[in-house]
Amino acid sequence: MKVFKISHLVKSEDLNHHGTLFAGRTAEWLVEAGFVTAAAEHGRPQDVLCVNVHGFTFKRPVEKGDILTIYGRIVKTGTTSMMIHVKAMCEIAVGQNVEGFITFVCVEQDTKKKRPHNIVLDETTDPEELELRERALHVQ
């Protein structure tokens, strides 16, 4: 599936009491990237709602002045739901900093009843994507 990316400059107002990127701000950015991925693939942002943040694994801190790029891609679909894998990586201090899975659903605007999104996972031979799809099957 297509990979979407968003970058953020880590500024003073994004920091915690340790002087590194606040986990709450990171979570906000990860959910935003997940939403962008789901909405862009679906084509109707007004139909897309976040229903579950399955947890994020923080692997290393992010410093002020770094550029954090968040990548999102759909790794699992149901009839009305789609699970997005998001990962954040620093552009300056290279390495993966945080990752996780988020589920979004599509709903009717007026009734808020779930509606099919008609997204089908494409065929892939990419080892990373295959591994993410396998992991997504076991996410609770």
Briefly describe each language-model feature range.
Residues 1-50, 108-140:
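Hot-dog-fold acyl-thioester-processing enzymes
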Residues 21, 35-71, 75-83, 95-101:
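Hydrophobic beta-strand-centered segment that forms part of the acyl-chain substrate-binding groove
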Residues 64, 75-140:
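HotDog/MaoC-like acyl-thioester-processing domains
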